[in-house]
Amino acid sequence: MRSLIALGSLLVLIAAACVSPTTTTAPAKEVVVPEQAKLEAAAAQYAPTDIGADISKLPAGEQQALSRLVEAGWVMDGLFLRQVWAGNEGLLLNLLTDRSPLGQARTHYFLLNKGPWDRLDHYTPFFAGVPPKPEGANFYPAGSTKADIEAWMKTLPEAERAQAAGFFTTIRRTANGKAGKPGFEIVPYSVEYQGELTRAADLLREAARLTAQPTLKKFLETRADAFLSNDYYASDVAWMELDASIEPTIGPYEVYEDEWFNAKAAFEAFIAVRDDDETAKLAKLGAELQGIEDNLPIEPALRNPKLGGMAPIRVVNVVLAAGDGNRGVQTTAYNLPNDERVVREKGAKRVMLRNVQEAKFNLVLRPIGARVLTGAQQKNVTFDAFFTHTVMHELMHGLGPHQITVAGKATTVRAQLKDTYSAMEEAKADISGLFALQRLIDKGVLPRSMEESIYDTYLASAFRAIRFGVAEAHGRGIAMQLNFLIDFGAITVGPDGAFAINPAKIKDGVTALTREIMTLQAAGDYAKAKDMLTRLAVVRPEVKKVLDKLTGIPIDIEPRFTRPGL
């Protein structure tokens, strides 16, 4: 068994990055950091755990293909490091020269966060001498402002403006500005990251030659082409059609690092093997979605009578997560791609990371349940309930209002709810996921024995999410739900401060909150959404007391990926 340590791989990637003609790395600075104990305490918020998958049943050729994909995944890791900040690579090289215990503590926490800012503490720098985290990351020129970029984009012809705002381009400074104003140019990722993407494309083509699975071969070949052409459409379609024992997600996807425009995609990789048994189990949940939509607790006119074809759901066990897929708090599931053309034609694939979820449950959620819930309800916190609710959360993102009409004009919930959208949508998926699971239990699709566990596990998981902070969408959404259900009487707080589900009111409370969120979404009611979040997305004293009891329980996991047999 070999352990994949990010440190060694990043050294290789950084060395390779130095040959890229478009790389701009800030000069290394003298680093002054907090004491070793403080850094180690910060790192202890993440519980180290081995993450791997059984690949013994894969034929030799598939195992070799998987090994090439892992190598390509590490290329994404190095690219993401550069995308976060132009100074990241120089700073890391500086850190690596110090092999003392203090130096290793510095490097460790840097790699956990993919930079010198604490992702659990509102991006507070944990090194002296570094700037605040750039909101535009390294997608835009250092020293430019959001207003500079917006003003420049307004001068562009429509086609160029679309490229400038696209997922797969950076904006760089040029000497061609006019009247003393800054000049900018559009640089495709295929040029900006040419050296690394050429290497990644070569590895994908090697993997394509090794696999005997046609849909995997097609995805790898088209994604290799995309790395060099900057056109990802065909490979996104091939990824949606992928039906293979190996499930790779690799390339530029999520846009969270671009805090200016949420436009630029960050490189990530999830290299995984499919869990066929668990994937088959989920198929029956997907088959129930139209029935759930038809019975949502909203006015019938607000329901979608035709959801369309069922998008793929995959349950996988991760072999490697890298880049944007492995920084700070780990994701447990994702919906991709983000290209609206592909989503219109093919939908979005939901991928559930089962081994990551199981690690979080054992190391974080179960211990939280033991401190938060009453003794009688602690035994009901189960991985099966946690996993099933996570699945239903992802599925419920696709149900309820999306395309709406406001003041006679067609629009979207996202556009109308603006800055409240993410928190309200996460809350909707959570609470309506409980509503949907109860319906499936009542219908006999899921066993009646799951009824208590879904609510008690949800309550324990609420405290897990609030620990991420109410400035983050998931944390705001769960705080709003928790306080609503407490006010409704569906969740009670005992004299000892322990929380409990009230069986007599929880179902009605879940239904009421599902109705309230979906109704305001259908109306595009920004004022009501803002009011709900202002009133309810807060940490009340009784919740704060419980959070204070969770000292010593990790906030999340630090995966250490293992590859037996590779």
Regions found by a protein language model. Give the residues of each.
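Contiguous, non-catalytic segments that form substrate-binding/exosite surfaces or channel walls
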Residues: 189-378, 382
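An active-site-proximal "capping" alpha-helix that borders the catalytic cofactor pocket
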Residues: 213, 422-439
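Long, well-structured alpha-helical subdomains associated
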Residues: 434-531
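Post-HEXXH active-site segment of zinc metalloproteases
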Residues: 401-427
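N-terminal helix-rich structural modules
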Residues: 28-211, 215-219
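Active-site recognition of the HExxH zinc-binding catalytic motif
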Residues: 388-402, 429, 434
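Bacterial signal peptide processing site
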Residues: 19-21
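C-terminal motif of bacterial Sec signal peptides marking the signal peptidase cleavage site
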Residues: 14-17
